Amino acid sequence: MTTPAKLTTGDIRGHLIGQTLPTTFGVAALMSVALLNAYYIGKLGSEELAAVAFIFPVVIALSSLGVGVMVGINSVIARSLGAGDVAQAARRANFGAVFAVAAGTALGLILYLLIGPLFRLMQASPALLPLIHEYMAPYALGLPLLLLQMALGGVLRGQGEAKVSSLIQLGYALANWALNPILITGALGFGGLGLSGAAYAMIAGNAVSCALSLLFIARTPLPINPALIRECRMGESARAIVSVAGPAALSNAVNPIGLSVLTALLASEGQAAVAGFGAAGRLQSFAVVPLLALSGSIGAIVGQNWGAGETGRARLALREAWMFCLIYGFGVGAVLFVWGDWFGSLFSQDPAVIAQFSSYMAISVWGYAGFGLLIVANGALNAVGRSSIALAQSFARVVLLMLPFAELLRGAWGAEAIYGAELFANLGGGLLAVWIAWRVLAAHKPAALA
């Protein structure tokens, strides 16, 4: 299926399109699962929805860890292939898979034992704890599968197999589309399991993803063969992956944390502001899917060329990706700016909510391009082993730009200060990320792969 380091030759723009387009469909498929979950859980009742509100931050944190593992494996494999060391790439692929299962098992057991204390610490009421346990118990035991499917995704993405990765994501989505109505609310004569059904559907989806991944990986130059683990220098392999995975996981978690703080600040501006902000955020999450896909695709292209010493091609890929961010970001922003009221009316009939929705759209959409610049820069930095810089950029965007702006101006501007804070952080963070990432890629000193 794969020619090693196939992204080190050929047209860069063609590679960007070929990697990003299928990834866009894959990301959209995953997002559809989240919407489907929300729909069926909403049919269970208000208590179940309240339980999910407590569960969501924990799931986001653990998903961020999985993304970090995927990015770390992607990075080391892409650079090894670029350097022409297929044997090392194969060792790292197999070590990464075993590492993911081991980490998932350890974390899953810890989480299972701490479900009660953790959610009591989060101030979950006694009435909600049984519902939370319904979901979190199977989720915790299924954590090894979650991290394994992320790791296998990293093996494929590091080889530039974006189309295959997207097919696997679609397989995950199809499994959930089929199982969610049956396992959550009940269908086809089955009574439904409630919240635990949502967790079991996710586990089944991850099992499908793992099976498909192993099937496709077996046809690449990096098949999963645990016997290769014996040839690895364990400590060095772990450091190579964790040095990227750790900061990447934290970087991925920073933005949701920042948005949670903004939501808390917005609560003082009234329920309509919170509702409008939340509804607009759901629309925004779909609007930026191509930017998210591009940030996930840039890694294999930059990583392989960086490992091969093709600094010029790596920088060209980054420049072309940034141009897309500017064109798409401002283009889709203009559409949402013009049609803000109409989109708002799709989410609510309350004039106050629609007004806040439109106000948020009128301000925040002009920052999409900057957000794209930042996440693409971070994807490139992770690919070349500079994930600590990517983490610093994400941290600076939220902690040094977004939150101070919102807090300082909230008294004078109200809700618009919070909307403006997101715009300021995206534009400022994006420009800073461009300056830093371009300088890093100009100095060709690849991080050691050991």
Language-model segments: what does each one mean?
Residues 49-109, 146-165, 276-340, 371-390:
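Small-residue-rich hydrophobic transmembrane alpha-helices
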Residues 14, 29-30, 66-67, 107, ...:
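Alpha-helical transmembrane segments of multi-pass membrane transport proteins
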Residues 1-23, 77-144, 175, 190-246, ...:
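Short alpha-helical transmembrane segments in multi-pass integral membrane proteins
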